[in-house]
Amino acid sequence: MDNETKATTFSKSTGLPRKRFYRARAHSNPLSDSHFPIPISPAHVDYSLHFPKFVEADNKFIKKVEFADIGCGFGGLLISLATLFPDTLMIGMELRDKVTEYVKERILALRRTSSEGQYENISVVRTNSMKYIPNYFEKGQLSKMFFLFPDPHFKEKNHRRRVISTHLLDEYAYVLRAGGIIYTITDVEELGEWMKSCLEKHPMFESLTQEELVSDPVVELLCSATEEGQKVARNGGQTFRAVFRRIAYVS
C-alpha cells in the first residue's frame, strides 16, 4: 500500500483503517474454491509471521494458538479478547479477502498505537474454515472456538453450507481439547435452534450450566464485542445463544 492510498484509507485521528474502504459481500459461498495458500498440515503453518513477538532468538515458536474465531468478520471479538487474555494466542479465520485485509490492517494499526505492547497475541488468516480446520490445528490444540452470527443459509438446499453441522462438529471436536468451549450466537431463531440441536445430538459436547455461563467473562462479549451483535442490539433484536463444552470421552 503506497503512502497516498494509506493516508486515504486510514483515519488521521485514530490511525485505524476505515471500514468503508474494505466493504465486501455479507457472506461468501463456503463450498466454492477460492484461491489462497493452504498449509498441508499444522506443522506447515508459519505462525511466526502472525505473532512475531512470540518467537525466540532461535526462531522457535514458544506458544500455540488456543482460540479460533471462525468467520471473524471485522475482528471485533478478537480485539476485545486480546486484552482479556493477553497471554493467549488467538486467530480469526475469514473467507472474504477484503474483510481479511481490513482485520489485518486493524490489528497492525492497534499494535503500532498501543503503548503497552498489546494486540501482539491476535492475528487473522484468509481461509475456508469449513474445509481446512485440520490443516491449521493439531488434535486437542484449541480451548475455545467462536461461531458468531454465521450465515444462516435459509434455503433448505443450502443447509449443507452452514458452519455448524453434525459432520463439522466431528472436526471441531478433534481440534478442541477436553473441556474446550464452543460459543455460538445468532439473531436468526431457526438457525439458533439448528446449532443448539446439532450440539445437543453430538456425543462429544455437553451444554454449559446457567451458573457456568454467568461466570464466563467471554459470554457477554458474544454480542457486545462484535459489529453484527451491536447492530442487532441497536435494532432491538433478539439473539439465540448456545455454548457447549467438549467432553473428555463418550461413556
From Swiss-Prot:
It catalyses: guanosine(46) in tRNA + S-adenosyl-L-methionine = N(7)-methylguanosine(46) in tRNA + S-adenosyl-L-homocysteine. SUPFAM superfamilies: S-adenosyl-L-methionine-dependent methyltransferases. One of its GO terms (molecular function) is tRNA binding. It comes from the Eukaryota. It is an enzyme of class 2 (transferase). It is found in: Nucleus. Keywords: Methyltransferase, Nucleus, RNA-binding, S-adenosyl-L-methionine, Transferase, tRNA processing, tRNA-binding. GO terms for cellular component: nucleus. Pathway: tRNA modification; N(7)-methylguanine-tRNA biosynthesis. InterPro entries: SAM-dependent_MTases_sf (IPR029063), Trm8_euk (IPR025763), tRNA_(Gua-N-7)_MeTrfase_Trmb (IPR003358). The keyword Mitochondrion does not apply. The keyword Endoplasmic reticulum does not apply. GO terms for biological process: tRNA modification. S-adenosyl-L-methionine binds at G71, E94, L95, N128, S129, L148, T226, E227, E228. Its EC number is 2.1.1.33. The active site is at D151. PANTHER family: 3-DEOXY-D-MANNO-OCTULOSONIC-ACID TRANSFERASE/TRNA GUANINE-N 7 - -METHYLTRANSFERASE, TRNA (GUANINE-N(7)-)-METHYLTRANSFERASE. Catalyzes the formation of N(7)-methylguanine at position 46 (m7G46) in tRNA. NCBIfam families: tRNA (guanosine(46)-N7)-methyltransferase TrmB (TIGR00091). Belongs to the class I-like SAM-binding methyltransferase superfamily. TrmB family. This is tRNA (guanine-N(7)-)-methyltransferase. It comes from Arabidopsis thaliana.
